[in-house]
Design a protein with these regions (language model features):
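Cysteine-centered iron-sulfur cluster-binding motifs in ferredoxin-type domains/subunits
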Residues: 1-17
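Iron-sulfur cluster-binding electron-transfer modules in prokaryotic oxidoreductases
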Residues: 19-233
Length: 233
């Protein structure tokens, strides 16, 4: 199955059939009976080992232009994915420093405001750290203390998609422990997939899996009056 568990079919179904939850349950059953697929094993290896992920990403920028060398010369895909046009278009150039290296783990805010946690996800951490940096610094500019634990890992969405229930439990426990050190009042994220996974809104999961409310950064900024501040400029 190529289902991404996006839930689009569920929202459009007049009978609200939980197709994403059914697909996820079937994948867990298949994995339990036959073991992980080849792709599932690769997903588990990457998302379950942060050190390996960092190592592979360091060399990915150099290898990216080679990913499409086997496309037939007659294929129109070469116009879109040729090595000459690939850089900066289809795959972003990997930055020299990831988000963990760009921002501190804790930023002290105003004493009368609570601590908010930041869950960046692998995309903002390793591919778009400049966006992740804004995710960290904007709440701080609003006076909040910001906790960005460097022990956090993958949200578990790839593991859920591959039917790897045990890895989901491992990642969830790791992330719970990572944020427990500062006990934030809520956790902010800018990744829709991470938010859905951590809020328990994907494939029939229920409840905030980290034990803390997870909020999209845009909703947080609106709730804190940023729209009114921008309108007044």
């Amino acid at each position: 199955s190529l289902c991404l568990l996006c839930g689009s079919c569920v929202t459009k179904c007049p009978n609200r059939v939980p197709t994403d939850a059914i697909v996820a349950a079937l994948r867990r059953q298949i994995t339990g009976e036959h073991g992980l697929s080849a792709i599932g094993k690769k997903v588990a290896t990457l998302t379950g080992h942060k050190t390996l992920m960092k190592t592979l990403l360091k060399g990915a920028d150099l290898l990216a232009p080679l990913l499409f060398t086997k496309i037939p010369e007659s294929s129109g895909l070469r116009l879109r994915f040729s090595p000459e046009t690939l850089k900066g278009r289809s795959l972003p150039p990997l930055p020299e420093r990831n988000l963990f290296a760009r921002v501190p783990e804790f930023l002290q805010g105003e004493p009368d405001k609570p601590v908010v946690g930041i869950f960046a996800g692998y995309g903002l951490t390793y591919l778009y750290p400049q966006i992740g940096e804004l995710l960290v610094r904007l709440p701080h500019r609003l006076g909040y203390s910001v906790f960005f634990p460097k022990a956090q890992g993958c949200c578990g969405m790839p593991a859920l998609s591959s039917g790897n229930a045990s890895l989901i439990d491992t990642l969830t426990q790791n992330n719970r422990q990572a944020f427990a050190a500062r006990q934030p009042s809520l956790i902010l994220t800018a990744c829709a997939s991470c938010q859905g996974m951590l809020k328990g809104e994907v494939a029939g999961r229920e409840g905030h899996v980290l034990g803390v409310e997870v909020v999209d950064i845009h909703q947080f900024l609106v709730d804190n009056g940023l729209a009114e501040q921008l309108a007044a400029l």
